[in-house]
Regions:
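Signature of multi-pass transmembrane helix bundles
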Residues: 1-65, 225
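Juxtamembrane loop-helix boundary motifs flanking transmembrane segments in multi-pass membrane proteins
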Residues: 10-29, 59-62, 66, 82, ...
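Membrane-water interface of transmembrane alpha-helices in multipass transporters/channels
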Residues: 28-34, 59-71, 136-145, 178-185
Length: 225
């Protein structure tokens, strides 16, 4: 079989040369994808630091200590890839951050469904990178409208592995002009780093709970663990 492959293709060119060419293209694409994943991971870190910095301004506490207490939820989400499955851990760590149980019990399950900031960031970044790679035209108004509609769509996206990208396929096609091949690449890119997006989502839920608790929580005298 190997000999027949190496003897040549339909046009007489050595098949081994074709295989090398395809392998080189795949390698280049994979390198680009790895760079995209790295950039998005850094953006997720920046987003979490930003969210907890804002929350810290309301509660007057160290944002990095607040973020550090949410790390069990972050690492649990890396494994489950599901916001819904991580709710018990997220809820426990949010209470440890000083949020009252009533507020945490309301905000965390709700945000597991409607707060998908990490997934939204990831979809926008992947879509932009793919359009640049494919030479597709784009401009700021197009992406502004896409981000607005994506934010609404993410409210309806299920908190399960791959739920966000599947919910976003419609607007990727209608607003950005993605065909079947582009949508397939988006799904592949998204699934490859789904765990990081989910971890960003659930960890950010704790920051929202802190802000809501500041305004509506009934504080008790229990020490913060």
């Amino acid at each position: 079989i190997v000999q027949s492959i190496c003897e040549g293709g339909d046009d007489g060119a050595p098949a081994a040369t074709k295989v090398d060419s395809i392998t080189g293209q795949v390698y280049n694409i994979l390198m680009v994808f790895i760079k995209i994943i790295g950039v998005i991971f850094l953006l997720h870190i920046f987003l979490l630091v930003f969210q907890y910095t804002i929350a810290a301004l309301f509660v007057h506490r160290n944002p990095f200590k607040l973020l550090g207490k949410m790390m069990p939820a972050y690492f649990t989400a890396l494994g489950t890839q599901s916001s819904a499955a991580t709710i018990p851990v997220t809820l426990r760590q949010t209470v440890k951050n000083g949020v009252t149980e009533d507020i945490a019990g309301f905000v965390i399950p709700l945000c597991a469904t409607i707060h998908l900031s990490g997934s939204t960031l990831k979809i926008v970044a992947c879509a932009l990178a793919l359009m640049i790679m494919q030479g597709m035209p784009f401009d700021f108004p197009m992406f502004a409208g896409f981000i607005f509609m994506l934010g609404i769509t993410m409210v309806a996206a299920p908190g399960v592995p791959g739920g966000a990208i599947m919910a976003a396929l419609g607007i990727l096609a209608s607003m950005l002009g993605f065909g079947e091949s582009e949508q397939a690449l988006m799904i592949a890119l998204y699934i490859a780093m789904d765990s990081f997006g989910t971890a960003c989502n659930v960890t950010g839920d704790g920051a929202i709970a802190l802000i809501i608790d500041k305004f509506f929580g009934k504080k008790d005298l229990r020490p913060i663990q």
